[in-house]
A protein has these predicted regions:
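Nucleotide-activated sugar donor-binding and catalytic core shared by glycosyltransferases
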Residues: 1-122
Length: 122
């Protein structure tokens, strides 16, 4: 199992969390994606699925211009060397697993994601 991961925003962030792998979420999108995110970020606050589902900043997110090689390297290095930081993510993943539970995890995750989507339309 990996000690840390660098993930593009998407389902891989939830998969990494379920596997208990601390990770950094990075995404650089098109102009349209950036504009869309700017319009809804005050309503949702996060882009990574673990953060969205827990409504908390569990995994660091570097988006667009913040996703510089230096920042990515610094964050990944911190995940690998700072045991407290990695432990904090793993504790968050444990809360995520409690939220998602055992049977019906896909349905519950989808419902939470739909709740967030509905908030952005309100």
């Amino acid at each position: 199992m990996a000690n840390a991961a660098l993930c593009a925003s998407g389902t891989v962030t939830l998969e990494s969390a379920i596997l208990g792998v601390p990770h950094l979420i990075v995404y650089r999108g098109s102009f349209g994606m950036r504009l869309q995110y700017q319009l809804v970020k005050h309503k949702i606050g996060y882009i990574g699925l673990p953060n969205l589902l827990l409504d908390a900043s569990i995994c660091p997110e570097l988006l667009d211009t913040a996703a510089t090689p230096e920042r990515i390297a610094d964050e990944c290095t911190a995940l690998l060397l700072d045991e407290e930081r990695a432990r904090a993510q793993k504790d968050g993943f444990a809360r995520l697993m409690e939220l998602l539970g055992q049977p019906g995890v896909i349905r519950r995750a989808a419902e939470r994601i739909l709740d967030v989507a509905r908030r952005t339309q309100a």
